[in-house]
Amino acid sequence: MGGRNFRYIALDFETTGLDLQTDEPIQIWIMEFDLNGKVLWGFQSLLRPVKKATELKSIVCFITKLSIQQLESAPRPEEIIEEIQWFFWEDTIIVGHNISFDLHFLEKFFPWLKRKTTLD
């Protein structure tokens, strides 16, 4: 990669379901790490869905172990932009399991994000 210093972050979302058209992120995890796998920095936040949290499928609460009350008091995605934007610099490589799923939600709910290099 040409001697450039790249940043590596792991990204993971919990969502209300698997459909990008109708579902929303309800939790985000971001971890920056070095080439040796040492975690340098991390961020985690619950996210309040646009839909009323009371409309969530009970299976979502069961799988994620998140309560409706936790989600109703969480920030909306646009309220955490300042806290997460520094993770996504031009030299950032995003890694994760099934990362395309997370990237689709990231790009929909954080549209300012430009496509970065990814590793799945």
Annotated model-derived regions:
Residues M1-K116:
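Conserved non-catalytic scaffold segment of RNase H-like nuclease domains
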Residues L119-D120:
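Short, flexible loop segments at boundaries between secondary-structure elements
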